[in-house]
Amino acid sequence: MDPVERLIAAESPERAEHVLVVNAPGLVEAARRAAPRVSLWCDDRRDAGTVPTGLLLEDFDESSLAGVDLVWLRLPKALSALDDDAERIAAWADPRVRVVSAGRQRAMTHSMNDVLGRHFDTVSASLGVAKCRALRASGPRRRRLRWPRERTHPELGIGVIAHGEVFATNRVDDGTRLLAELCPDIHGDELLDLGCGSGVLATLLARANPGARVRAVDVSRAAVASTLLTAEANGVAVEAHWAAALHDWPPECLDVIVTNPPFHRGIAKDSEPALAMFDDAARLLRPGGRMWCVHNSHLPWRRRLAEKVGPTAVVRQNPFYTVTRSVAR
């Protein structure tokens, strides 16, 4: 267990009937000592791969949460993600449910208390321990679910539906928008949105390429679900996959890859996921296939893409974001 997980366990009631562990796989063994029944929800495929599959929930829904009387939750970075999780727990868990959540103090704000307070009658905070702090909640308020949420973007001609865990939720962030404006002119028979988020790029590619096979991949369950909802709402077909790597995909199977790669994992900056995505692209693109990438302009991705994928040119740029096109060797 890391310090956040240790604090969750330390601040928890000694016993429960059914513990649900949310995005904190290191707590599984402690949960087994605390309750006869344990379930685990992992949004991130990389976390899910570290625990026994028999504990993993297939969905975070009413049937999965029924009877849960204790929730151990790692606080997410985004308030929207906490709001989405909290409203489902409050709506569907046992009326006696107690939530013990924690995070690193540098990443916490008082707004997290406010979010929990929208869904629970009682919210309290622990003292700081090892630069972490716990938030406890009880007394769930049963309310109509507000997630996932839809927003129309007339300038792109689409609506976006997203869960709270998805980056930018149902908005279109400035980087994605810069690449999205090019999607009507990106064509191929086999296309992939790598790190699909809410499915904006995949949906636009499917619209621009009727009859083509458009796939989308993300490590986040919420992103995959949101992509499917967004595609369906816009009347296009997209195959969405929950995956952390594409080792099982055959080489040279794609004509086009588009991506807005992450450079954070949680609250920590991490370039490795983006570099791994570039490696996947190099293997999956057919010779002459194209990779379209949008990234923060200060990052050295043009050079890394040229090294890993092939000749790379800047297609569009502003002071904040750059779109590059790489041609696979």
What are these regions (language model features)?
Residues 1-52, 174-259, 265:
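Conserved SAM/SAH cofactor-binding pocket of Class I
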Residues 86-87, 99-120, 127, 268-327:
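Conserved Class I SAM-dependent methyltransferase catalytic core
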Residues 68-74, 254-262, 292:
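Short SAM/SAH-binding signature in class I
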Residues 130-190:
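SAM-dependent Rossmann-like transferase core, predominantly class I methyltransferases
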Residues 79-154:
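N-terminal auxiliary segments of SAM/dcSAM-dependent transferases
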Residues 36, 94-97, 211-212, 289:
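A short helix->loop->beta-strand "cap" motif at the edges of active sites that frequently abuts
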Residues 58, 100, 126, 161, ...:
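General small-molecule cofactor/ligand-binding pocket signal
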Residues 56-67, 240-248:
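Short acidic low-complexity segments
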